[in-house]
């Protein structure tokens, strides 16, 4: 049986979608087989072959207090969150670092992106656009002060968010996590799926007609709580959250593997980590999109795993009622699965006529796909599955029993064993070290990285170069470099033991902006089938998986610039908990024309070159991709890997302020540093060097300096300060990752010295930092909205 410290329980539910504005309304309509699919009137449908959508009908959405400046997707998320908190008898958390927010999304603020191009590009739309804004705004609304991030793995995002919530609780990093997902119906996904000919002109018919999807919108929120915390406050408990599985197909950016390998890996890992038998699972809320490739692969996966193992399995897809809600789908379907479990009723899959039922009987075997009408069924354990663009797969299990989850947090030390470095001043570790030796610095206020086909050709990937967007090119090259630098070859034998955690501030927003500008000009019927797959934030991580053959954990996190360091914290947790042996943790952002434009609207790009501590009103906008290879000590030792540094501990905290600002969020950095030191079992006196995030913008630089003064006091006079943005500008998530990569290269002696800073009596002075004097380095990163990550590494 699961130990109490590993038990995660659900204590609150929130839901809004096309068949209801709260959990009870949605559930009652689901049991009555009500569909919310109708003709849409909210997007341009001229010359479009499909005009259906499952849209939310909640007239008071724009009346939720203090949400006037938020995108529709964030309003949907806050609506579901508030219901879940009320259900759990919880409210505002006073900034507690024990309360976290993890939200999934696919297209983020796509409604605001559309509005931007249709209304003369107002600056007020910019901070509503990124996926980053969602969880950050929820955290501000409920005053959560713990780990705050968004999972951007397209249609698997909502499921992975709940899985990560449990990982944080089992790691001792949180007592309560508000987890879920949200997406709004908008012209970008509508036009994109039209371009792929993936929409059905009729209501979608999962596991049946399989002629396309119908898009939906909404949000699902789940309050995940440690069992002991819930017990202490005498909370109502819906169910236990047992194990989960997250995998990558390494196959195709939009289509699943026909053999279902990746799906089956995720499902089997969820079962194994739950400690349940296959025949204990009574109901599965399937991904079931209504496309032939997806449904056929899922059919195969379910039959392969459960035939001859479970003769009492029921499966349904609720997408026939609520549509495909993209990043919200996994969260919405998790709520449906939990309601099925707790009410002993299973919702139907709609759309079968008599002839369809004959065909279903031929291919369903002993699996009951619950056609057309819901049914009563005694349930003890249920599963929810989500599969996504990029080849991402996620499965999670809920139960009335505690299961046998055996997560540990002590699977050995975690080492840095390799790097891939792509910056505006060249690509590769050796190039970067040479640039540091020559003290290379930015020479303009906006700079960008580039990748050429020959760099792909070195790794046998030249044919794929032109298929990848700019962001993906940066990520794929740095990822392939990192594997080479770490001397790791991906094989069929080790592919599932290697994972990817991509961190990004803005992700694919640049491509999304380009895609939207085109359809605003030419109409939704003329979206680009070539560009659309690259509008999802996890495309870069998906392409990296495809090019390298990595089939393990694959997740994209996004919450501002600190995402590049947050990815290292997430990856460290994955290795500590024994989910993978090796994880590529990345920080990647691009500076294409569209991105430069929207940052210009915010007036944060300096008029000239801006370097740390120059007290300017802007920064040098930059980009790049940094991949850091993390590995457990046992496997690193076994293969004789070079160890650049050891990850001792990490901390993540939030002092939430309106997204797009940092002013007033100082406490968040203080708390992140304290948590990192505690996790590393070190004191302030053990830290000799800090690798910071100063960029030249005075507001940001002052937060960093003032926090150091509060945390370190007089001992600050003895500490060195590395600022990588001296060399690469404000590269956002790439700079956050680089802060750790640079420090690790100094700890290993690969970088002998660097021009850095000293803080003496409150004043910043320049100095030369010798690597031979370094032992313990504190790396820190910030995000607009007030989230901070701190990580301690050592020799």
Question: Where would I find each of the regions flagged by the language model?
Answer:
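Flexible, low-complexity linker/loop segments at domain and module junctions
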Residues: 1-10, 93-96, 276-280, 306-311, ...
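Glycine-/small-residue-rich "gating" segment that lines the acyl/pantetheine channel
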Residues: 31, 39, 121-124, 160-163, ...
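ACP-dependent fatty acid/polyketide chain-elongation machinery
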Residues: 1-66, 228-240, 335-350, 394-464, ...
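Conserved beta-ketoacyl condensing-enzyme motif
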Residues: 9-10, 34-150, 185-190, 278-294, ...
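Acyl-CoA/ACP chain-elongation machinery
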Residues: 173-211, 244-258, 286-295, 310-367, ...
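Active-site-proximal alpha-helical scaffold in enzymes
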Residues: 77-87, 142, 146-181, 214-235, ...
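Condensing-enzyme catalytic core mediating Claisen C-C bond formation in acyl metabolism
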Residues: 7-11, 31-40, 203-274, 283, ...
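Active-site pocket-shaping loop/turn-to-helix segments
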Residues: 18, 63-82, 119, 123-130, ...
């Amino acid at each position: 049986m699961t130990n109490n410290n590993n038990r995660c329980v659900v204590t609150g539910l929130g839901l809004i979608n096309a068949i209801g504005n709260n959990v009870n309304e949605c559930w009652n309509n689901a049991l009555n087989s009500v569909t919310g699919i109708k003709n849409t009137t909210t997007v341009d449908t001229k010359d479009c072959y499909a005009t259906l959508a499952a849209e939310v009908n909640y007239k008071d959405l724009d009346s939720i207090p203090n949400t006037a400046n938020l995108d529709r997707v964030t309003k949907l998320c806050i609506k579901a969150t508030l219901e879940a908190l009320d259900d759990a008898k919880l409210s505002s958390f006073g900034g507690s670092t024990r309360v976290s927010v993890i939200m999934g999304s696919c297209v983020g603020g796509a409604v605001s992106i559309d509005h931007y191009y249709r209304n003369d590009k107002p600056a007020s739309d910019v901070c509503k656009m990124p996926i980053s804004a969602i969880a950050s705004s929820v955290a501000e609304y409920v005053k959560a002060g713990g780990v705050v991030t968004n999972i951007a793995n397209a249609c698997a995002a909502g499921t992975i968010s709940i899985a990560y919530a449990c990982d944080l609780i089992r790691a001792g990093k949180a007592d309560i996590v508000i987890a879920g997902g949200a997406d709004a119906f908008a012209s970008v996904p509508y036009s994109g799926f039209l371009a792929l000919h993936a929409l059905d002109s009729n209501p979608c018919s999962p596991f049946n007609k399989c002629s396309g999807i119908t898009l939906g919108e909404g949000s699902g929120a789940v309050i995940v709580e440690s069992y002991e915390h819930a017990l202490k406050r005498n909370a109502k408990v819906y169910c236990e959250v047992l194990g989960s599985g997250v995998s990558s197909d390494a196959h195709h950016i939009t289509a699943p593997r026909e053999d279902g390998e990746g799906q089956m890996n995720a499902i089997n890992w969820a079962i194994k980590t739950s400690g349940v038998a296959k025949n204990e699972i009574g109901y599965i809320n399937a991904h079931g999109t209504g496309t032939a490739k997806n449904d056929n692969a899922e059919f195969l996966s379910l039959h392969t795993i459960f035939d001859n193992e479970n003769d009492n399995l029921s499966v349904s897809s609720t997408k026939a009622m609520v549509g495909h809600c993209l990043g919200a789908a996994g969260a919405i379907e998790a709520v449906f699965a939990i309601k099925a479990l707790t009410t002993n009723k299973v919702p139907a899959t709609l759309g079968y006529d008599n002839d369809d039922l004959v065909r279903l009987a031929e291919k369903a075997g002993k699996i009951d796909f619950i056609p057309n009408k819901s049914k009563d069924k005694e349930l003890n354990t249920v599963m929810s599955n989500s599969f996504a663009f990029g080849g991402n797969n996620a499965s999670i299990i809920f139960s009335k029993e505690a299961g046998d989850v055996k997560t540990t947090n002590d699977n050995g030390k975690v080492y840095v064993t390799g790097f891939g470095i792509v910056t505006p001043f060249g690509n590769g570790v050796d190039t970067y070290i040479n640039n540091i030796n020559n003290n290379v610095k930015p020479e303009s206020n906006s700079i960008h990285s580039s990748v050429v086909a020959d760099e792909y050709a070195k790794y046998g990937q030249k044919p794929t170069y032109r298929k990848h967007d700019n962001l993906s090119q940066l990520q794929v090259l740095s990822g392939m470099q990192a594997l080479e630098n770490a001397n790791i070859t991906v094989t069929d034998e080790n592919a599932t033991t290697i994972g990817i955690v991509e961190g990004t501030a803005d992700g694919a927003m640049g491509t999304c902006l380009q895609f939207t500008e085109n359809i605003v000009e030419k109409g939704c019927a003329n979206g680009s089938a070539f560009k659309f797959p690259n509008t999802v934030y996890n495309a870069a991580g998906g392409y990296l998986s495809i090019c390298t053959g990595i089939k393990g954990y694959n997740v994209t996190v996004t919450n501002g610039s600190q995402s590049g360091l947050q990815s290292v914290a997430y990856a460290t947790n994955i290795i500590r908990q024994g989910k993978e042996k090796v994880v590529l943790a990345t920080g990647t952002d691009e500076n294409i024309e569209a991105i430069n434009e929207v940052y210009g609207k915010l007036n944060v790009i300096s008029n000239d070159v801006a370097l740390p501590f120059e007290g300017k009103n802007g920064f040098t906008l930059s980009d790049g991709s940094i991949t850091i290879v993390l590995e457990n000590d046992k496997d690193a030792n076994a293969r004789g890997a070079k160890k650049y540094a050891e990850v001792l501990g990490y901390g993540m905290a939030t002092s939430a302020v309106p997204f797009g600002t940092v002013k007033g969020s100082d406490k968040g950095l203080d708390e992140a540093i304290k948590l990192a030191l505690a996790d590393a079992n070190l004191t302030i006196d053990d830290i000799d060097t800090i690798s910071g995030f100063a960029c030249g913008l005075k507001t940001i630089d002052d937060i960093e300096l003032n926090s150091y003064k509060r945390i370190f006091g007089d001992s600050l006079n003895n500490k060195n300060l590395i600022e990588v943005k001296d060399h690469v500008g404000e590269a956002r998530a790439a700079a956050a990752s680089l802060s750790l990569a640079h420090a690790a290269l100094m700890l290993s002696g690969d970088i002998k010295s660097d021009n850095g800073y000293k803080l003496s009596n409150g004043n910043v002075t320049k100095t030369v930092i010798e690597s031979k004097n370094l032992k313990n380095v504190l790396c820190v990163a910030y995000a607009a909205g007030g989230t901070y990550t701190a990580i301690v590494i050592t020799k």
